[in-house]
Each structure stands twice: as structure tokens, then as C-alpha cells.
């Protein structure tokens, strides 16, 4: 904000000398208002700055250490992931895939679980809607509304079965 105002004032300086004088006053007030807070926090950030530097250095060392540790298991994980059998993966490196596998279904699980609830909610809504629709059209068009109701009720059931199977498979995988 300050740099943009400064640039705008610089552009307007040759146009009017009075505006330049006003800009000097603004600079003076800005320098005073900015200088007093700058001077007061400066001693306090000095100590955290060194702490932050040390902390960042520790983090970098820790990250390098982690990366160096994880390079071999990551390659092993990728190679084991290339092989389709998870049992070999468990036997090769028992420590790593166990945290890896629950995290995968845990991230995958919330997506299948809300969808069956949505499918069941849609199925119940369709069933209630079909019940409401069935009573009036039974007199007018009996064959069409039951066909619609059967199709609409069968589709969410299929989706729900697929989703439940996938979630069960994920649970079995975990």
C-alpha cells in the first residue's frame, strides 16, 4: 500500500509542487508512525529471529534426515506398490506399509461412506416419492409409474451395493 501510494505521488510530483509538499508531510507522518512501532518490536524479534533460525536449521536437518531415511523405504514402497500382492509388501517391510495402508483407506473411506448414505437417502426419498406418485397415477397410468419406480429404486440399490462392496473391500484391505 505504501509503495503504491509512493509511486503514485512520484508520478504526480512534476504536475504540482503543492502536492509534493503535502507528500513530504505524509512521508514525515508515515516515518514517525512506522518508526516508533519498528523501534519497539525490533529488540523482541531479534531473540525470536535467532530462535527461528535455529528452529529452521533444525527443521532442515530433520527434513534431510527424514528424506535420507525415507528414500530407501519409499523406493521399496513404490516397488511393492508396483507388485499387486500386498502380502509381500507386508512381509518385505512390516513397519512402513502398515501406516501407509490405513491412511489410504482412511482417506478413501470418508468418500464411500457419505455416498452410501446419500444413496440410501435418495433411495428412501425415491421410495417415498414413488409411494406418493403411485397413489394418484394408479388410476390414470398404472404401467408407467411402477416401471419408473422400479427403475429408480433398482438404480440406487445397485449403487449402494457397489459402494458397500467397495467400502467392505477397503476395510478388508486395511
Curated annotation (Swiss-Prot):
Secretion signal, residue range per the UniProt entry: none
One annotated GO biological process: segmentation
Residue ranges, compositional bias (Polar residues): 47-57, 84-95
GO cellular component labels: nucleus
Region Disordered, annotated ranges: 1-174
GO MF annotation: an example: zinc ion binding
Tree of life domain: Eukaryota
Record keywords, A-Z: Developmental protein, DNA-binding, Gap protein, Metal-binding, Nucleus, Repeat, Zinc, Zinc-finger
Biased composition (Basic and acidic residues): 155-174
Protein's cellular compartments: Nucleus
Residue ranges with Low complexity bias: 27-36, 58-72, 116-125
Annotated family: Belongs to the hunchback C2H2-type zinc-finger protein family.
Function: Gap class segmentation protein that controls development of head structures.
Name by which UniProt lists this protein: Protein hunchback
Organism whose genome encodes this protein: Drosophila mulleri
Amino acid at each position: 500500500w505504501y509503495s503504491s501510494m509512493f509511486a503514485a505521488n512520484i508520478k504526480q510530483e512534476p504536475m504540482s509542487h503543492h502536492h509534493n509538499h503535502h507528500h513530504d508531510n505524509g512521508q514525515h507522518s508515515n516515518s514517525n508512525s512506522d518508526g516508533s512501532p519498528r523501534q519497539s518490536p525490533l529488540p523482541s524479534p531479534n531473540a525470536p529471529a535467532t530462535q527461528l533460525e535455529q528452529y529452521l536449521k533444525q527443521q532442515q536437518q530433520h527434513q534431510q534426515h527424514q528424506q535420507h531415511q525415507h528414500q530407501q523405504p519409499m523406493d521399496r514402497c513404490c516397488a511393492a506398490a508396483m507388485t499387486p500382492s500386498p502380502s509381500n509388501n507386508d512381509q518385505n517391510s512390516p513397519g512402513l506399509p502398515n501406516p501407509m495402508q490405513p491412511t489410504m483407506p482412511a482417506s478413501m473411506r470418508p468418500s464411500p461412506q457419505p455416498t452410501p448414505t446419500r444413496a440410501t437417502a435418495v433411495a428412501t426419498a425415491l421410495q417415498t416419492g414413488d409411494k406418493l406418485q403411485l397413489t394418484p397415477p394408479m388410476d390414470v397410468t398404472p404401467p408407467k409409474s411402477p416401471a419408473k419406480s422400479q427403475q429408480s429404486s433398482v438404480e440406487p440399490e445397485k449403487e449402494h451395493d457397489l459402494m458397500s462392496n467397495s467400502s467392505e473391500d477397503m476395510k478388508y484391505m486395511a
